[in-house]
Amino acid sequence: IMDLAITQAHERVVSDLRQSGLNYRIVRPCGYFSDMGVLYDMAAKGRSFLVGPGHNKMNPIHGRDLAEVCVDTAEGDEVEVEAGGPDIMTQREAAELAFEVAGKPIKITVIPMWLARGLVKLIALLSTQFGDLANFIVTAGEIDGVGPKRGTTTLKHYLESLHAANRKNR
């Protein structure tokens, strides 16, 4: 993942902070619940798409929990902190949970990695920015993103809040 443009940009900022002489803190979330909202959106529509088989593990964190980690880190002695949510699960398990919360039968379409990599190359020809984003998404589908459990809000609770809002807006 370190060869991706988006990761390199983040790491340049980290390097600059380290060399700046400033009193700094770096918080590295493993993923965000807000990114998981797309799983609920797809499940509510009846079909979810996964890049690759979805066996990689992750423990994304809720924004509110991440804010608490940031405050705690700013007040603490640790300079660099990784932050994950309370639940470690695979991407497939997260998609299945979204279907459960949406009350829909599980229908998951797997986009093979070879096809996803080809699509990334095509997208990159059309737009460097979207190509970099697509490359990040595909790469994230291949690796684990697990960190220390620092959050308390579960993914199920987050998805249930999306479901409640979805039902209210109908």
State the predicted function of each range.
Residues 34-41, 72-81, 104-106:
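Glycine/proline-rich active-site loop of Rossmann-fold NAD(P)-dependent oxidoreductases
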Residues 42-52:
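A short C-terminal helix-loop "cap" of Rossmann-like NAD(P)-dependent dehydrogenase/epimerase domains
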Residues 52-74, 79:
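Substrate-positioning beta->alpha
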Residues 93-142:
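Terminal hydrophobic/aromatic helix or amphipathic segment near a protein terminus
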